[in-house]
């Protein structure tokens, strides 16, 4: 069967299953009745767009390639609620909790003219409880809906986050790691620069995500601190991307020697030393696009935590669904990812995630060691990071 036909057939089946599940959830919540003023409609518990879900649920390279080729700006959560318009309402408060008694609630204020709200930072595979309060312009509560529950998608663990004015934001948690461990949610976020962050974005950044440290992995020549955020410490720890983090002796002749910049190892070391201290967490790490340098440091972090290559690739390639453009592990030919591991190498950009990984394994796991061990060897022997620091990072970020 031709790869494209195979892809469409597989996706059609998955779409039918997802639609049937969504219908079942809808009927379970509402019993097939029209909404009343005390009821909410739950919107899209699958969390993300069809295009992102097609990629995350792809069964093989063919399906991944087809999903990546259809990628556009879909890096947003889409789960939300809607309600019937009410008279004399100045504002609504959406109240959300993971507890049935609504303890430890989060509140979101919505203008009285609105009839929908999309959540920003839900967790996958999590049951939530929600209600809506309406207020007049004197602050008097007019109505409160009953508490309703919903559960987010459970077929994947990746967590994309909406931060208004910032693109390509996601949690690096949720991935399985070696030793029956999982990377914790809510401690390390990656994304693009904060130049255009809005007040709503800042509220998500500080109140919902609770960011304590902003790590900027750009050098001062192409970036720097652009916004003062109360309670958030800023560190600039510049580095380069992909194979340029490896010493010249490891470089393939095709890319030429001299790409390695010794300052990079100082930046990488600084990142790990920051993550080793619990008081610095949660951390937001970024470059300009949140793609290349950020993708490289996240490869090192999740890799040394014990995430397998397939998970590292997914985290990297999800950038393709943001406004930052395509980021694939390699070029593609005849519906296959190419072994040289270079997607782009021209005057516009150098994108070589697969090449970086191959060289890492070649030089730092020469006797067939695991990817986790290869990155550990690199961090210790090239970057001068102590084993104590690495173990502290693991203790902080794994569960």
Short names for language-model regions:
Residues 33-284, 297-399:
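Cys-dependent protein tyrosine phosphatase-like superfamily
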Residues 1-39:
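Gram-positive cell-envelope targeting signals
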Residues 289, 293-294:
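Ser/Thr-glycine-rich phosphate-binding loops at phosphate-binding pockets of nucleotides
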């Amino acid at each position: 069967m031709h790869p494209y036909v195979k892809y469409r057939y597989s996706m059609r089946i998955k779409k039918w299953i997802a639609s049937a599940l969504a219908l079942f959830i809808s009927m379970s919540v509402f019993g097939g009745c029209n909404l009343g003023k005390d009821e909410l409609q739950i919107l899209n518990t699958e969390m993300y767009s069809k295009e992102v879900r097609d990629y995350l649920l792809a069964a093989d390279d063919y399906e991944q390639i087809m999903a990546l080729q259809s990628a556009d700006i879909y890096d947003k959560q889409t789960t939300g609620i809607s309600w019937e318009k009410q008279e004399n309402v100045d504002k609504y408060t959406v109240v959300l909790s993971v507890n049935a008694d609504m303890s430890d609630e989060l509140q979101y204020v919505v203008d009285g003219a609105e009839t929908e709200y999309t959540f920003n930072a839900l967790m996958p595979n999590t049951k939530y409880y929600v209600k809506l309060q309406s207020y007049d312009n004197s602050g008097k509560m007019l109505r409160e809906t009953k508490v309703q529950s919903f559960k987010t998608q459970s077929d994947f663990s990746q967590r994309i986050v909406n931060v208004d004015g910032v693109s390509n934001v996601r949690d690096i948690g949720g991935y399985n790691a070696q030793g029956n461990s999982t990377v914790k949610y809510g401690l390390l976020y990656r994304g693009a620069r904060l130049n255009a962050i809005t007040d709503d974005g800042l509220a998500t950044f500080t109140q919902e995500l609770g960011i304590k440290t902003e790590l900027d992995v750009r050098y001062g020549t192409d970036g720097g601190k652009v916004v003062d955020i109360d309670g958030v410490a800023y560190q600039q720890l510049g580095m380069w991307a992909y194979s340029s983090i490896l010493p010249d002796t490891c470089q393939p002749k095709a890319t030429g020697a001299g790409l390695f910049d010794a300052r990079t190892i100082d930046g990488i070391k600084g990142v790990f030393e920051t993550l080793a201290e619990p008081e610095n967490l949660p951390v937001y790490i970024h470059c300009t696009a949140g793609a290349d340098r950020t993708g490289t440091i996240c490869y090192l972090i999740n890799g040394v935590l014990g995430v397998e290559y397939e998970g590292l690739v997914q985290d990297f390639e999800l950038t393709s669904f943001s406004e930052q453009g395509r980021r694939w592990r390699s070029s593609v030919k005849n519906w296959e990812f190419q072994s040289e591991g270079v997607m782009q190498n021209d005057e516009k950009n150098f994108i070589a995630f697969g090449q970086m990984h191959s060289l890492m394994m070649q030089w730092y796991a020469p006797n067939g060691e695991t990817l986790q061990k290869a990155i550990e060897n690199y961090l210790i022997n090239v970057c001068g990071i102590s084993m104590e620091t690495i173990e502290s990072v693991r203790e902080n970020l794994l569960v």
